[in-house]
Amino acid sequence: MALKHDWTKEEILEIYNKPFMELLYDAATIHREHHDPNTVQVSTLLSIKTGGCPEDCGYCPQAARYHTDLEGNDLMSVNQVKAQALRAKASGSSRVCMGAAWRNVKDGEEFDNVLEMVRSINKLDMEVCCTLGMLTENQAQRLAEAGLYAYNHNLDSSEEYYKEVISTRGYQDRLDTIGNVRKTNVTVCSGGIIGMGESEADRAGMLVALSTLNPQPESVPINALVPVEGTPMEEQEPVPIWEMIRMVATTRIVMPETQVRLSAGRTQMSREGQAMCFFAGANSIFAGDKLLTTPNPDVSEDMEMFKMLGLNPQKAFEKKSQPESVAAEKSKYQSQGEKPRWSRPEHKIDRNLEAQQNAKTKA
């Protein structure tokens, strides 16, 4: 059966709102047609540069304009990252995703160091993913040459609700970055967050945006908002587990071949709830004691859960072969001293402005 790239919001809403047991059955059936239901990818998310981001994302404690008591750190060294990757591999992870709190990639020493990090992790026979903000086609090509397996750039929500969350960067800017990644052999990881105050129609809208990409993203992380004090969304109520399961199941039906990743918010989910998500089609998790800045179950807890459920960690490069890594001196693509161009909507989001004012008061 050919993948469908013309899903409408109405079609996706109809799936999302099916009777719960029917939705689970449909999703589980499709999941088994495309994936081993007993195999789950384990990925470790590593914050290589924390805090100080100039964006105003309403959910994010790394935004410099909000007061969140976050302890920032400069870019980690290549050796520090390699040591963390070795630790992750020993714990059962097959992928390392490096996150830097940047609006965009800038050519120069720091990006050169990130490229070396990619090379060093690739040599450990692990899948390497990065989430570094916006990037140009040339920068994407250089990451691909270094041996990058995946690039993460989330859409966050529907295009309509996105405007209630972020004013410093447009939705199309995110799609443009995904487009630049698609011009290389790097796979795309892109998903979003539920629980930010969006409607079911917004959740469907996000899945429309993702599923109509051709090809569809190889990975789609589904995050449940973790409210952080000091951010504009600090008072949002936790997402009910039933909504998370519905979102996972709908994503699986709409994008059958994609790896659906249970991401932020797992500390709020029982093992029973997570098991239902796996049954509904989730086949990837982020492991480690925190995801960038938010709490996450300990790896040993996850391995215990896997044992209980009869799940096996996915081996590296099961979905796609290991990328070749080219040494810096042999690189076909050189620094052009460029940075991405992006729109600056700069419309007013009241709760973001209020949190920003509160931060000034506390300072």
Curated annotation (Swiss-Prot):
Pathway given in the UniProt record: Cofactor biosynthesis; biotin biosynthesis; biotin from 7,8-diaminononanoate: step 2/2
Species of origin: Christiangramia forsetii (strain DSM 17595 / CGMCC 1.15422 / KT0803) (Gramella forsetii)
Protein name from the UniProt record: Biotin synthase
Cofactor requirements of the protein: [4Fe-4S] cluster; [2Fe-2S] cluster
Organism placement in taxonomy: Bacteria, Pseudomonadati, Bacteroidota, Flavobacteriia, Flavobacteriales
Residues reported to bind [2Fe-2S] cluster: 97, 129, 189, 261
This protein's UniProt keywords: 2Fe-2S, 4Fe-4S, Biotin biosynthesis, Iron, Iron-sulfur, Metal-binding, S-adenosyl-L-methionine, Transferase
Ranges annotated as biased composition (Basic and acidic residues): 316-353
Disulphide bridges, residue numbers: none
Assembly: Homodimer.
Pfam families, alphabetized: BATS (PF06968), Radical_SAM (PF04055)
Catalysed reaction equations from the record: (4R,5S)-dethiobiotin + (sulfur carrier)-SH + 2 reduced [2Fe-2S]-[ferredoxin] + 2 S-adenosyl-L-methionine = (sulfur carrier)-H + biotin + 2 5'-deoxyadenosine + 2 L-methionine + 2 oxidized [2Fe-2S]-[ferredoxin]
UniProt domain Radical SAM core: residue ranges: 38-266
Domain of life of the organism encoding this protein: Bacteria
Keyword 4Fe-4S in record: yes
